[in-house]
Structures are given as structure tokens and as C-alpha cells.
A protein has these predicted regions:
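Conserved ABC ATPase signature
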Residues: 71-75
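H-loop/switch region of ABC-family ATPase nucleotide-binding domains
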Residues: 131-132
Length: 206
């Protein structure tokens, strides 16, 4: 909404922004799923009768409603990741920041969690991801910002970033191998080739 957050307190920012850590085991602190998702609301002093419907809604969105009364220890790593996301969604943030959302996951769980985040984004939640996974960046992010030495050096689509040799070099990134292929075989506009390839891949395997 174009708001400058510099003048806001941490408490004020926390009502707008949710943060999900890379490892859910470092974030989860309650043994039961319901209590974990309800924790933030209880800390804010929300009445118990108001908490349950908010928790139920967050669990439903995250596909965890059947596990409401389960212990967290019974879940897979990917499901635990969703519990941490649900705990943030229960607080109704406008922006969700995720640190390496697919770290340590196989292709199946990688796809599952990214498709889930894509759906959340389509429902109106702004998603910001911190990632070193360049394929994920190409496949799922319409917009990318590159930071090097504490300064923003790139602000464009993921395809434009990863087909820009100057930005990639300054940030110690590699241009995508698709870009290298396009250059090698003499394609006039490598960025268009890369985008078309990614679009085709998504259409084929989803």
C-alpha cells in the first residue's frame, strides 16, 4: 500500500508482517498443532472463543484441518513447515516472509509447498521469499530483488535478473544454463527463450 515502515514500532509491523523461518523445528515451540497455531493469538490477548475459528481457518487453508488435535511430532517436515505458515496466517498478516521455503525438501514436497504458496498469493497474501535456489526463483517468482553487500543492485523479473550477466557477476550468481544455451545457439532474445521454457515446463509437469 506504499506505507513507509521506518516510523512504525516492531509491534506495529508485526500486525502487518509474518515471518516463517527456514527450519520449522527452530520455530515450533508447542507440542500440539492447535496450541502452536493459537500461540500468537493468545500472546496478543485474543479471547479464547475468537481464537478457535481463526485457528480453524488457518489450518483449513494450509490443508491441516484433519490434524488439528495431533501432536506436531507426528508430522512430516513439509507438514511442520505448513504449521509454521498456519501460525502466521492465523494472525492475518498482509505480507508473509519465508526464509528458504523449500530447503531440505525433495521434489515432491518442493512442488507441494510452492504450489500452496502460489495459491496463498492468489488469495491476496503478498509472499516474499529469501532464496538461493535459482530454479525456484525462475519457476515461481514474477519479481526478484538482488542484494549484494547490503545494496540493491537488481529489481526486475526473475528471468531478467538471471539473464543479466552484469547483475549476476556483481552478486556472485550464475546466469541460468538456459541463458547460456540460448547464447550458444544464437537465439536473438535469450530472456524470451528462458521464459518460454519455464512456462512450458510448468505446463508439462503440473
Amino acid at each position: 500500500k506504499g506505507q513507509d515502515l521506518k516510523g512504525q514500532t516492531i509491534k506495529e509491523r508485526s500486525h502487518l508482517i509474518g515471518f516463517v523461518m527456514q527450519n520449522p523445528n527452530q520455530m515450533i515451540c508447542k507440542p500440539m498443532i492447535y496450541d502452536e497455531v493459537a500461540l500468537g493469538l493468545r500472546i496478543r490477548g485474543v479471547a479464547e472463543e475468537e481464537i478457535e475459528p481463526k485457528v480453524d481457518k488457518a489450518l483449513q487453508i494450509c490443508g491441516l484441518a484433519p490434524f488439528k488435535k495431533w501432536p506436531v511430532s507426528a508430522l512430516s517436515f513439509g507438514q511442520k513447515k505448513r504449521v509454521t505458515i498456519a501460525s502466521m496466517l492465523a494472525l492475518d498478516p498482509k505480507v508473509l516472509i519465508l526464509d528458504e521455503p523449500t530447503a531440505g525438501q525433495d521434489y515432491h514436497h518442493y512442488t507441494e509447498i510452492m504450489e500452496f504458496l502460489k495459491k496463498l498469493n492468489e488469495e491476496g497474501v503478498t509472499i516474499i521469499m529469501i532464496t538461493h535456489d535459482m530454479h525456484l526463483m525462475l519457476e515461481y517468482t514474477p519479481h526478484a530483488i538482488v542484494i549484494s553487500d547490503g545494496k540493491k543492485i537488481g529489481d526486475a523479473s526473475a528471468v531478467e535478473i538471471l539473464t543479466n550477466e552484469e547483475i549476476a557477476g556483481r552478486a556472485n550468481l550464475k546466469t541460468t544454463s538456459l541463458y547460456d544455451l540460448a547464447v550458444k545457439i544464437g537465439i536473438e532474445d535469450p530472456s524470451v527463450f528462458v521464459q518460454n521454457f519455464i512456462d512450458y515446463e510448468r505446463g508439462t509437469y503440473r
